């Protein structure tokens, strides 16, 4: 219920994407990056269908959260996650500044001054209501 603004300054990796979009309005600096990738596994994994279903459930929850909090479609987000021609030895995509805005993940390119200005604007709007 409180006004919230996020600002991606450097690299927003892994859980940084859901954190960045969880705010009411989001910014990214022109050189900021967002790494979009599916849930990853480390260590020993039991190779049974239930393990796959569990990871799919986790991925669906994260994808649903991100899509509910920004303007990207589920299909576009999943396409970015499963891109194979961009990250070496991995799947996913790296979006830089304006690309994150153009895909609908982030609201606007801007720095700390724009983020603070937007927050002040949102606080002012709340006080009027």
Regions found by a protein language model. Give the residues of each.
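N-terminal organellar transit peptides
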Residues: 1-17, 21-129
């Amino acid at each position: 219920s409180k006004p919230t603004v996020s600002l991606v300054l450097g690299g927003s990796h892994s859980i940084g994407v859901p954190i960045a979009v969880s705010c009411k309005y989001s910014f990214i600096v022109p050189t900021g990056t967002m790494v979009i990738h599916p849930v990853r596994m480390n260590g020993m994994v039991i190779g049974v269908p239930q393990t796959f279903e569990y990871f799919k459930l986790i991925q669906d929850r994260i994808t649903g959260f991100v899509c509910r909090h920004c303007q990207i479609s589920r299909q576009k987000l999943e396409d970015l996650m499963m891109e194979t021609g961009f990250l070496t030895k991995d799947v996913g995509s790296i979006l830089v500044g304006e690309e994150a805005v153009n895909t609908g993940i982030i609201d606007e390119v801007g720095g700390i001054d724009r983020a603070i200005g937007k927050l002040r604007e949102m606080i002012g709007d709340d006080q009027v209501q």
